[in-house]
A protein has these predicted regions:
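A short, aliphatic-rich beta-strand micro-motif
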Residues: 6-15
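Amphipathic alpha-helical "output/dimerization" segments
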Residues: 31-51
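Short regulatory alpha-helical coupling segments
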Residues: 61, 74-94, 125-133, 151
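Catalytic-core segments of nucleotide cyclases and related cyclic-nucleotide turnover enzymes
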Residues: 159, 193-236
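Conserved nucleotide-binding and Mg2+-coordinating catalytic segments in signaling enzymes
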Residues: 60-79, 100-114, 122
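Short catalytic/binding micro-motifs of nucleotide second-messenger systems
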Residues: 87, 130-135, 167-180, 211-213
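A short pre-motif secondary-structure segment
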Residues: 137-140
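Alpha-helical scaffold within the catalytic cores of cyclic-nucleotide enzymes
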Residues: 125-126, 157-175, 208
């Protein structure tokens, strides 16, 4: 701890043998020794709650982050979708989601092994992150399924985004992860826009129905939810 000529007291924050950072206190005039000592004691008191806050923040991050891909997981997705849906209702703004599934992923795992399958998931995640605009969010929905949240985006814009992602994955060689090219990697994507009275569960169901329509009718395509899809659904 030291005083510089510009009357700034620099206090290093330590706790539990960890360096947390530095607290700078600026004085209008040269401080007294008593003031310096008080600040030193105050810095010690600040360090422990700061350490606790950082640990809590890290625990929260871990609970909302998918460990394999590094993007947000289902827990974080549920919260983000609720907030986005509330905002869409309150401000009457467009809200769309994409449900993305890797075609024949079981065959990838069976042919190349689960470690290669994990690498594919990580590379696909990188493509999704590159495709995201500032307000977009990507989540791992589970297994080989991903969900993208597109706020202030109507159906046409969501379909355009879906096709950009699909084509990027179709032409991606995945950096030599696959030893052979007889197993092309493609995705099917379900697209759904929130209607006026839709809640989050209804929106997810629409995207899910669109996704499985795409998979039943050829795969490697992006399909927007419609009445035709609703009537084609096995549950209808």
């Amino acid at each position: 701890n030291k005083i510089t000529t510009s009357h700034i007291q620099q206090l290093k924050l330590f706790t539990r043998e960890h360096y947390l950072g530095q607290l700078n206190i600026e004085f209008e005039e040269e401080p007294s020794e008593k003031a310096l000592k008080i600040n030193e004691e105050a810095a010690k008191l600040v360090a422990f709650p700061l350490q606790n806050a950082l640990e809590y923040q890290q625990a929260l991050l871990c609970s909302e982050q998918d460990t394999l891909t590094g993007i947000k997981n289902r827990n974080a997705m549920d919260s983000a979708l609720e907030k986005a849906c509330d905002a869409s209702k309150r401000y009457n703004t467009d809200l769309s989601i994409l449900m993305i599934d890797i075609d024949h992923f079981k065959k990838v795992n069976d042919t190349y092994g689960h470690l290669t399958g994990d690498k594919i998931l990580q590379r696909l995640t990188a493509v999704l992150k590159q495709s995201c605009r500032l307000a977009d969010e990507a989540f791992r929905f589970g297994g080989e399924e991903f969900l993208m949240l597109l706020q202030n985006t109507a159906q046409d814009g969501a379909l355009e985004m879906a096709e950009r992602i699909r084509k990027s994955i179709e032409i991606n060689d995945f950096g030599g992860v696959l030893e052979e090219k007889d197993l092309p990697l493609t995705v099917s994507i379900g697209v759904a826009q929130r209607d006026l009275n839709d809640d989050i569960q209804q929106l997810i169901e629409k995207a899910d129905q669109s996704l499985y329509f795409a998979k039943r009718h050829g795969r490697n395509q992006s399909i927007v939810y419609s009445e035709e899809i609703k009537n084609d659904s096995p549950s209808s």
